[in-house]
C-alpha cells in the first residue's frame, strides 16, 4: 500500500506501488513531441523524477520502467526546447546516484545523447549535459563509460573533447584501483589523444589526468610516456607533410 511522505509525494515501496504511480505516465511518454504535446511530456518526466526520488529505484521493476521510458528520455534530452531537455537531464541526475552500478544497462542509452549535447553551441545545454555526465561518472563506476569517453575524444567538436576529458578525470578520482585496472588501456589511450589535442583546455585536463594515472599506475608510466612521444611525433610529421604538399600543390 502506498504511503505519503512529508512533502505529499507518494513513497514507492513495492512494484505494485510503482505500477499504480506510472499508469498515467505511460501513454504520455509514448507521445511524439509536438507543439501540442511537449508540455505534457515535460510534466510526465517531472513526475517520473519525483517517483525516482521517492524510493522507486529500490523496487525491482524500476529498471524495466526506465527501459520502457528510455526512448522518450533520450529524445527529450536532445529536444530544442530547453525546458524539456532540462527536465530529462533532471531525471538522469536523480536516477544515476541512486542506481549506482545498476545504471549499467543505460550507459549506451543515455551517455551518447549527453555527449551529443556537449557538442552543441548552446551553453545551457552543454552545462546541463556536463552535470549529468559528472554525476554518472562519480556515482556509477562502470568501466564501459571510459570507452564512450575515449570515443568522444576522437570527435571534431572541441567542446565535446574538453567535456569528455573532464569526465575522465572525475571517473578516475571516483573509482578505486581495482575498477580502473580493468580499463587502464582506455585511460592510456585518452592521455595519448589529449596530449596532442588542439584545444588548450583539453591539454590542461590531460596533465591532471596523467597525474592521477601516474600516481595509480607508476609501473606503467614509462611506457605511456614513450607512446605519447611517438603519437606527438607522428602528428607533427603528418602536419609538416601536409604543409609541404600544399606548398608545392602536390
Locations of the language-model features?
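Hydrophobic residues within the alpha-helices of tandem HEAT/HEAT-like
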Residues: 47-53, 73, 77, 87-99, ...
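Core helices of alpha-solenoid repeat scaffolds
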Residues: 15-29, 51, 59-74, 92, ...
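Eukaryotic acidic, Ser/Thr-rich intrinsically disordered low-complexity regions
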Residues: 2-7, 188, 192-250
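Short acidic, glycine/proline-enriched loop segments that cap or flank alpha-helices
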Residues: 57-61, 156, 175-182, 197-201
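Short inter-helical turns and helix N-cap capping residues of alpha-solenoid HEAT/ARM repeat scaffolds
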Residues: 36-37, 80-82, 121-123, 156-158, ...
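N-terminal "cap/leader" segments of large eukaryotic alpha-helical scaffolds
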Residues: 1-56, 236-250
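Active-site loop segments of alpha/beta catalytic cores
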Residues: 103-106, 118, 122
Amino acid at each position: 500500500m502506498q504511503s505519503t511522505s512529508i512533502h505529499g509525494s507518494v513513497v514507492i515501496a513495492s512494484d505494485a506501488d510503482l505500477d499504480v504511480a506510472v499508469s498515467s505516465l505511460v501513454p504520455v511518454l509514448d507521445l511524439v513531441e509536438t507543439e501540442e504535446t511537449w508540455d505534457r511530456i515535460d510534466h510526465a518526466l517531472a513526475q517520473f523524477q519525483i517517483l525516482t526520488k521517492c524510493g522507486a529505484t529500490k523496487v525491482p521493476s524500476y529498471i524495466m520502467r526506465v527501459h520502457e521510458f528510455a526512448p522518450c528520455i533520450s529524445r527529450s534530452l536532445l529536444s530544442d526546447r530547453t525546458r524539456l531537455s532540462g527536465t530529462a537531464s533532471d531525471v538522469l541526475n536523480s536516477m544515476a546516484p541512486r542506481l549506482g552500478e545498476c545504471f549499467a544497462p543505460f550507459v549506451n542509452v543515455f551517455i551518447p545523447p549527453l555527449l551529443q549535447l556537449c557538442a552543441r553551441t548552446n551553453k545551457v545545454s552543454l552545462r546541463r549535459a556536463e552535470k549529468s555526465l559528472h554525476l554518472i561518472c562519480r556515482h556509477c563506476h562502470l568501466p564501459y563509460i571510459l570507452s564512450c569517453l575515449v570515443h568522444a575524444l576522437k570527435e571534431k567538436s572541441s567542446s565535446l573533447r574538453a567535456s569528455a576529458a573532464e569526465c575522465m578525470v572525475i571517473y578516475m578520482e571516483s573509482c578505486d584501483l581495482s575498477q580502473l585496472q580493468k580499463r587502464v588501456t582506455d585511460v592510456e589511450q585518452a592521455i595519448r589523444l589529449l596530449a596532442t589535442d588542439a584545444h588548450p583546455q583539453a591539454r590542461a585536463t590531460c596533465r591532471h589526468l596523467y597525474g592521477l594515472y601516474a600516481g595509480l599506475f607508476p609501473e606503467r608510466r614509462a611506457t605511456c610516456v614513450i607512446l605519447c612521444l611517438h603519437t606527438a611525433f607522428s602528428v607533427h610529421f603528418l602536419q609538416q607533410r601536409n604543409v609541404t604538399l600544399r606548398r608545392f600543390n602536390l
